[in-house]
Amino acid sequence: MEKSRLGRLLVLLTSLVLLLAACSGGDDSSGAASEAAAGSEPAAEAESEVERGEVVIGSTNFTEQELVAEMYALVLEDAGYTVERSYQLGSREVVFPALQSGQIDVTPEYLGTLLEFLNGGAGEATADTDETLGLLTEQLPDGVTMLEPSEAQDKNALALTQEKATELGATTVSDLQGQSDLVLGGPPECPQRPLCLPGYEDTYGLEFASFQALDAGGPLTTEALNNGDIDVGLVFSTQGAIAANEWVVLEDDEGLQPAENITPAVREDILNGEVEELLDGVSSALTTENVIALNERIDVDGEDPADVAADFLAQEGILGEGSGAAPASEPMTDTSSEAAS
């Protein structure tokens, strides 16, 4: 009887020990699994996060450049990047080497003009955007690439007052054929530039009565056109004066002027999938018409480019209404375009 009770007690103790060991082992396994899961979460998050460092945005020295550069800066800042603004650096001869050397990371460019800058003025740029972009890509130095071109193009154009355009029935450059009594006004170098007077003569067969040396779509051209001192003025196709004066810009129906789509030129070492998506988003919102209106707000109405850029991006739904604009690093000193110069 005593042995029987002792045997049952030993069995009970053995079962209890085994049960405790099983529970303890289960707890360790659960703890290890929890630790493993906890440890894997930061790694997964790290893989999904994009590294957002500093990006330097540069521009040449006219307002449209600063306007678009500021749009690039704002969308990158909104996504969490640290942005340094280096605006109004000078001409393309200064800005593009800065991009190539890594002093800046992004700058707005113009397809045809950049192609001719890089190929030494070989005359390869055409009116076709894709063709010109393809040729430009072949000329780009290592480490620099072009993102998606915008629809907006800033290039040489011929403008008339509403009254003169109606009188001539002109909507295209070809409509000026046979009008040999017209006076053309433009920059002093126009008679020597292949995309200016010689180009209109050779491509369209135009014959002007005379040429007045003024400026490149600036105040002298504006005054002369509005006063009737000239009949046709050489302008840039996105300048604000077009909207302010309600000029008629003639369609370049024979494609004399090369494609000059506003396009981000970017150093490849900052691209991470997100940067190009953000900058391409800006490009997709830009058209020649809305850039004219934005330039008018700056050049004619006197608004600050940073404010205009932020307002536009908010209206397009690219930035939230509360996103602010940081001040530019340099004051504006030149409001004339160089895209087609």
Task: Give a label for each model feature.
Residues 118-147, 227-229, 241-254:
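Ligand-binding "clamshell"
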